[in-house]
């Protein structure tokens, strides 16, 4: 059987478009990219890095210098805080969730370790790309900063002593 190259190309283009649209929905449903139009999100998807991780992979260690923010497109990642005697899971993050944002806004050391719980596909935004967005006064950067500020505000309110 001989396959028509046009049909094969069309199938792979369709599969790629379907995957991109799925990722686009995941991003638009997540808190980091809330309020950013689909056209701008499509551009962002092209510019950012996708990387697959296997269960058990460590994305970063507590105490490391951070250079990127991550968005879970598929799978799950747990954020673990180590103490002198053991470690405890702070969060388990699924599709649409993001982590590592302190690297972009605070240039701080990682406060916890990120471990892949189930095989995961992550979208990575490096510090240099984020800095470029801000320098360009991009509408994407303004919205991301507002969304990060909201997340920080929610976190502070949730953890205030009563």
Language-model features and meaning:
Residues 1-162:
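Cytosolic regulatory regions built on CNB/CRP/Popeye-like sensor folds
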């Amino acid at each position: 059987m001989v396959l028509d190259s046009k049909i094969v190309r069309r199938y792979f283009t369709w599969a790629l478009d379907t995957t991109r649209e799925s990722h686009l929905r995941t991003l638009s449903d997540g808190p980091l990219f809330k309020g950013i139009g689909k056209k701008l999100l499509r551009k962002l998807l092209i510019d950012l890095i996708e990387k697959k991780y296997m269960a058990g992979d460590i994305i970063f260690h507590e105490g490391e210098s951070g250079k990127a923010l991550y968005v879970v497109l598929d799978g799950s990642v747990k954020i673990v805080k180590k103490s002198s005697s053991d470690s405890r899971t702070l969060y388990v993050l699924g599709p649409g969730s993001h982590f590592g944002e302190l690297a972009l806004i605070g240039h701080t050391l990682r406060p916890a370790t990120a471990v892949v719980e189930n095989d995961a596909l992550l979208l990575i935004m490096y510090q240099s790309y984020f800095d470029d967005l801000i320098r360009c006064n991009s509408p994407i950067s303004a919205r991301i900063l507002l969304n990060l500020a909201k997340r920080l505000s929610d976190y502070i309110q949730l953890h205030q002593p009563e």
